[in-house]
Amino acid sequence: MAQRAVWLISHESGTPLGGIVKFSRRYPTVEKRAKVFNGASYVPVPEDGPFLKALLFELRLLDDEKDFLESRDSCSHINKTSIYGVPVGGEELWPVVAFLKNGMIYACVPLVEQTLSPRPPLISISGISQGFELLFGVQDFLSSGQKTDSELNTKLSQLSDLLLQTCPFGTLLDANLQNSLDSINSASVTHLQKQPAWKTGTYKGKPQVSISITEKVNSMQYDKQEIADTWQVVGVVTCKCDLEGSMPNVTISLSLPTNGSPLQDILVHPCVTSLDSAILTSSSIDAMDDSAFSGPYKFPLTPPLESFNLCYYTSQVPVPPILGFYQVKEEEVQLKITVNLKLHESVKNSFEFCEAHIPFYNRGPITHVEYKASFGQLEVFREKSLLVWIIGQKFPKSMEISLSGTITFGAKNHEKQPFDQICIGGTAYLKLHFRILDYTLTGCYVDQHSVQVFASGKPKISTYRKLISSDYYIWNSKAPAPVTYGSLLL
């Protein structure tokens, strides 16, 4: 007995779709079970927009839908059960439990633990009765004591946390949401008075919360048709909560912009007290699709005294921040190099620093360099056989820069010159080093106003972001190069 998804929809005539989704919750773990149980008859749960339109059509609540349709309006299709088959993308999502009450549509999709073709009797689907119980419980919670729109919005904002307690992983434990809310509130008060054994002391002083998001981007670029470039973002959220009391409670929310890249492979600190199942099931192993959970990512927690890493995550961003190619041509004791770098237009063009390190292994010291750089400066470290292209703090308006030159080497001295077992012959790389402050490649951020602190005093909340290059290599496209894959960049 479980639910695949739950919706609360406000029926509002005159809006573009005829209604507004006020709340929705999907259970990815239940959805995977549905895919196994239903087999070839499986129909995925659609996004909110398509589902809203299809459900309003089936309930005959669309403003512009007045025509008679045999499949929906004939006498043989009179609905007496509030259970519908909703047409979505040429298929039919069934069973959908839905009813309209006081301008609000309550809907859910129960799990059917067998094939849907032929349709099993309703009495054999235990998730349907559980779905009705859940929806009636939500209806009672929203209607109790509600007088104004602000009170309704407050209760809607509490639903997400309440369903974590009353319906974890889509399985209903308690349909009385008000009792659950009261128990959560009373528990938060009583627990503040008890010092946990793992917390060695309490903080005394001005309350403050500091949250820092650091993303590191890895990349391997080859400029070859037969080898795909790879890149990946690895992020960490670091927190320091200086709050009075033995058990202060904090809720931190990570948000993404509309075009942000969903966070995956999320690992959380043990101090996190509860978590939406959709956060834990988002994995980089699975193929990305439009249904990927894109936040907000809420972390209710009881913070320790010291600084701690709230969570780690990865993300599959669509493009690397800097694209480039590197070509090396050998002529006797000389090397001719060509480098081209381009900053992607979506990336913030403001660096704390940006450098390209170009090492030359298994050769003698650099004796002479002739070069032409369209931007920045070139520093030569002769004994280390290293060129450092200092790009600076900003790319030019064209977002593209280039470097070409000829390097002459002296006789080898195996004791002093850098040696590498991979970079032999033409195999060579350029490594980028950069840092961008107040920016993340995924777009992930913490809104100061979304941080909830349940402790004495009003804390000062500080948030920081930065993007740092990690293993960011551009290999010589004119020679063999070691190949890596996205899953190995971790």
Swiss-Prot record:
SUPFAM superfamilies: Second domain of Mu2 adaptin subunit (ap50) of ap2 adaptor. The keyword Transport applies. One of its GO terms (biological process) is protein transport. Keywords: Cytoplasm, Endosome, Lysosome, Membrane, Protein transport, Transport. The gene is AP5M1. PROSITE patterns: MHD (PS51072). This is AP-5 complex subunit mu-1. It holds the Pfam family Adap_comp_sub. GO terms for cellular component: AP-type membrane coat adaptor complex; cytosol; late endosome; late endosome membrane; lysosomal membrane; lysosome; membrane. As part of AP-5, a probable fifth adaptor protein complex it may be involved in endosomal transport. Belongs to the adaptor complexes medium subunit family. It is a peripheral membrane protein. PANTHER family: AP-5 COMPLEX SUBUNIT MU-1. It comes from Bos taurus (Bovine). It is found in: Cytoplasm, Cytosol; Late endosome membrane; Lysosome membrane. Probably part of the adaptor protein complex 5 (AP-5) a tetramer composed of AP5B1, AP5M1, AP5S1 and AP5Z1. Residues 206-476 form the MHD domain. It comes from the Eukaryota.
